[in-house]
Design a protein with these regions (language model features):
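Short glycine/acidic-enriched loop and turn motifs that connect beta-strands
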Residues: 39-45, 106-110, 171-172
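Beta-propeller blade termini
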Residues: 18-27, 83-94, 103, 147-156, ...
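A structural signal for beta-rich interaction modules in eukaryotic proteins
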Residues: 163, 178-290
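Repetitive beta-architecture junctions, highlighting loop-to-beta-strand starts
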Residues: 18, 51-55, 113-115, 172
């Protein structure tokens, strides 16, 4: 029996409490409570009850004072047993809130099992998963029960980010998912002057052994990347397109080109260190249309 705190209705046979996890989701210094109800049912479009499973989130607002979160998480897989297992993951995306893995061991197209990754926020767990892990590698002849058991919040590979172990008891196997470092990158592009003056031809273009005066402008693009526990060097491939709206138009002519290459596309491979800002300046010119 379980009380649906959203509607105040008692739900019979939902197995409320089958899985329980404790973690400080909203990072307020108080542990919060997450409760799985894997056989929770609700009426479907036809009016018949559908077993979807549900996960309830209770935020601790003070010592021993739990309140229901703004939203609870409802499963999307009929008979998938969403909420059979729960695993706190720590802060996967480094946003200051702790995240949660939720097992749905009979979900998916072939009922092989799914694991949903839900990120935390100030009001509990986000309703939409940011990632869904599937047991497609498992045999289809026997239910794999991928996600029946979960263990997270352990940095197994020592890269500074928590990893996740997923058990599939139908195959007597467990799978390790390593969390990859989070890289936050920002890019900017400026053009000066912002408009071409066709009367001012201050750049020289070499074409067919001839020097041609053309209208030009200076472009400057910058890239910065930073994050926690990153490698010493980060490799980026940067592509800058001029007049990109005409890229997929047949028989269209791009009017702006890069002066050095006389092409509408510039591709550069950049090797940055963590926190470094790299900028590159080049010239573009207005193409002569005869």
């Amino acid at each position: 029996m379980a009380s649906d705190n959203c509607k105040g209705i008692v739900k019979m046979g939902s197995y409320f409490g089958y899985a329980v996890a404790v973690t400080d989701i909203n990072n307020d210094g108080y542990d919060d409570l997450v409760v799985g109800a894997p056989t929770f049912m609700r009426p479907g479009f036809s009016g018949r009850l559908e077993e979807l499973g549900k996960v309830y989130v209770y935020l601790q607002r003070g010592p021993l004072h739990l309140q229901p979160a703004q939203t609870h998480l409802l499963g999307s897989q009929v008979f998938g047993r969403f909420g059979t297992s729960l695993a706190p993951l720590g802060d996967l995306n480094q946003d200051g809130f702790n995240d949660m893995a939720i097992g749905c061991p009979y979900g998916g197209d072939h009922q092989q099992g799914l694991v949903f990754i839900h990120n935390g926020h100030a009001g509990g767990l986000k309703n939409r998963p940011t990632q869904v892990l599937s047991g497609q590698w498992a045999s289809s002849s026997f239910p794999a029960s991928f996600g029946f058991a979960l263990r997270g919040n352990m940095d197994i590979d020592q890269n500074g980010y928590p990893d996740l172990i997923v058990g599939a008891f139908g195959l007597d196997k467990a799978v390790l998912y390593r969390a990859r470092p989070i890289v936050r990158a920002s890019a900017s592009l400026t053009v000066q002057p912002t408009m071409f003056n066709q009367e001012e031809k201050t750049c020289s273009l070499v074409k067919q052994d001839k020097n041609i005066s053309v209208s030009c402008a200076s472009t400057r693009f910058c890239l910065e990347a930073h994050g926690k526990h990153l490698p010493s060097h980060l490799v980026f491939v940067v592509e800058v397109q001029l007049d990109s709206a005409k890229q997929n138009q047949k028989e269209s002519v791009r009017r702006a080109l890069f002066l050095e290459s006389q092409q509408p596309t510039l591709v550069k491979t950049l090797n940055l260190t963590n926190g470094e800002r790299f900028c590159c300046e080049t010239k573009i010119y207005l193409r002569l249309i005869l």
